UniProtKB/Swiss-Prot annotation:
F-type ATPases have 2 components, CF(1) - the catalytic core - and CF(0) - the membrane proton channel. CF(1) has five subunits: alpha(3), beta(3), gamma(1), delta(1), epsilon(1). CF(0) has three main subunits: a(1), b(2) and c(9-12). The alpha and beta chains form an alternating ring which encloses part of the gamma chain. CF(1) is attached to CF(0) by a central stalk formed by the gamma and epsilon chains, while a peripheral stalk is formed by the delta and b chains. The gene is atpB. GO terms for molecular function: proton-transporting ATP synthase activity, rotational mechanism. It is found in: Cell membrane. Keywords: ATP synthesis, Cell membrane, CF(0), Hydrogen ion transport, Ion transport, Membrane, Transmembrane, Transmembrane helix, Transport. This is ATP synthase subunit a. GO terms for cellular component: plasma membrane; proton-transporting ATP synthase complex. The keyword Ubl conjugation does not apply.
Length: 244
C-alpha cells in the first residue's frame, strides 16, 4: 500500500504532480457540471437545471441555518463551489486508483492532507477577510477580547484548532476509505500468485465487501462534503455576526 508520487522540482520547490493532476481533474469536472446544467436556463427547467437548482437550494438552506439569508447570499457561490468540488474530489478515488510502477497517479485529491489543510486554510482565511470587511478592523479585533481580554490566547488556539480539525477530518475519512478499498483489492489479487483457483476464490470473496465498502464510502464522501460546507458557513457566521 506504500506508493510514491511523481514530483518535480521547480524554483527550489517540490510539486506533487499527482495532486496537481487530480486537483485539475476535479476542477474540470465541476466546471463541466456547472456549464452543462446552466447553459440553457428556462422557466420550465429540464432535469439538468433542476439538479443544479436543487444543489443551490440545498446550500441556501445550509446558509440559512447559520446566518441571515440577506447577508448569507454573498456566500452562496462559495458554498455551492465547495460542496460540488469536495464531493467530486471525494468520489474520484472511489471506483479505482491508477498506479504506474510504484507511483500513484489517480486517487481522491482529498485523501492528501496537504490538499485538505490548504482548503481549510483558504476558507478560514476567507472568514477573517469578510469579518474585517463587514465589521471593520477595529470592531473585528475586539471580538478576540470578548467577553474578557484574558480570552485572547484561547481565541487564537481556537482558530488553529478549527483549521486543523476542518482539514484533517476530511482527509482522515477519505484516506481511510481508500486504504481499506486497497487492502480488499490486494486480498482479491494476491492469491493468484499461489494458484488461479485460490485467486478466483479470493476475488469472489472480496467482491461483496468491496461493494459494501464503496457504498459506505459514497455515503461518507457525501456527508464530509456537507460537513465541510456547513462548518465553513458556521465559521463565516461567527466572524461576520455582531453578536460574536
Amino acid at each position: 500500500m506504500n506508493h510514491d508520487y511523481r514530483t518535480i522540482d521547480l524554483f527550489g520547490l517540490t510539486f506533487n504532480l499527482t495532486n496537481i493532476l487530480m486537483i485539475t481533474v476535479a476542477s474540470v469536472i465541476v466546471l463541466l457540471i456547472a456549464i452543462l446544467t446552466t447553459r440553457t436556463l428556462s422557466i420550465r427547467p429540464g432535469k439538468a437545471q433542476n439538479f443544479m437548482e436543487w444543489i443551490v437550494d440545498f446550500v441556501r438552506n445550509i446558509i440559512g441555518s447559520t446566518m441571515d439569508l440577506k447577508t448569507g447570499a454573498n456566500f452562496l457561490a462559495l458554498g455551492v463551489t465547495l460542496l460540488m468540488y469536495i464531493f467530486v474530489s471525494n468520489m474520484l478515488g472511489l471506483p479505482f486508483s491508477v498506479t504506474v510502477g510504484h507511483e500513484l497517479w489517480w486517487k481522491s485529491p482529498t485523501a492528501d492532507p496537504a490538499i485538505t489543510l490548504t482548503l481549510a486554510v483558504m476558507v478560514v482565511s476567507l472568514t477573517h477577510y469578510y469579518g474585517v470587511k463587514m465589521k471593520g478592523l477595529k470592531e473585528y479585533s475586539k471580538d478576540y477580547l470578548r467577553p474578557v481580554p484574558l480570552m485572547f490566547p484561547m481565541k487564537i488556539i481556537e482558530e488553529f484548532a478549527n483549521t486543523l480539525t476542518l482539514g484533517l477530518r476530511l482527509y482522515g475519512n477519505i484516506f481511510a476509505g481508500e486504504i481499506l478499498l486497497g487492502l480488499l483489492a490486494n486480498l482479491a489479487t494476491n492469491f493468484y500468485s499461489n494458484s488461479f483457483f485460490l485467486g478466483l476464490v479470493g476475488t469472489v470473496g472480496a467482491i461483496i465487501p468491496m461493494l459494501a465498502w464503496q457504498a459506505f464510502s459514497l455515503f461518507i464522501g457525501t456527508i464530509q462534503a456537507f460537513i465541510f460546507t456547513m462548518l465553513t458557513m458556521v465559521y463565516m457566521s461567527h466572524k461576520i455576526s455582531h453578536d460574536h
